[in-house]
């Protein structure tokens, strides 16, 4: 099915990137994690020691190439998968992504990537802003405590111990920032299908979304 596009939106910790990546691999589609792109900008802001509250400081994006290919996020020729998952980046990415200039630059890149045939793109404004004409829009949700548990497990797998209550606090704060920002707030597209993964495993959620894709457009990988 040439040109079939899936938009998956959802709050922090809902598992949208892991799920989207798994679905894309199973169906032979291209996965694009837009959240990783905002994290890359945040990483650059930290490395360049700019005033992160000053939108004009992000003009460095005119001279930087941020791309997403083969399941990796690149700044120029540098793969930054590990660096963008740091606590410093996580703490500041909502601020950075709230600036109209930053969003404009990255949405341009994302829409260009969206011209690729058979893609699954995940983020917070894909169905509403980046790919409003997507063939299938999914809004992935999960209970805050469940999202915190998943984030804690991810951190433990990386060798870190994190307090669950602190993670709940951080995720709740992130939800508020993402849903209340003036530019491209996190919200469900009117024609999006809600998938609640609170009581579903990763593979169960992947299976559910594959079923939705197949229902919407037939079996893509036949």
UniProtKB/Swiss-Prot annotation:
Q: Which CDD domains match?
A: CMPK (cd02020)
The entry's localization annotation reads: Cytoplasm
Q: What class of enzyme is it?
A: transferase
- One of the Pfam families matching this protein, by short name: Cytidylate_kin
- This entry's Enzyme Commission designation comes to 2.7.4.25
Q: Which domain of life is it from?
A: Bacteria
UniProt-listed GO biological process terms: nucleobase-containing small molecule interconversion; pyrimidine nucleotide metabolic process
Task: Tell me the keywords, alphabetical order.
Answer: ATP-binding, Cytoplasm, Kinase, Nucleotide-binding, Transferase
- For ATP, which residues are the binding ones? 10-18
Its recorded reaction(s) are: CMP + ATP = CDP + ADP; dCMP + ATP = dCDP + ADP
Listed GO cellular component terms?
cytosol
Kindly list the GO molecular function terms attached to this UniProt entry. Answer: ATP binding; CMP kinase activity; dCMP kinase activity
**Which family does the record assign?**
Belongs to the cytidylate kinase family. Type 1 subfamily.
Q: What is this protein identified as?
A: Cytidylate kinase
Lineage, opening ranks: Bacteria, Bacillati, Mycoplasmatota, Mollicutes, Acholeplasmatales
Q: Which gene encodes it?
A: cmk
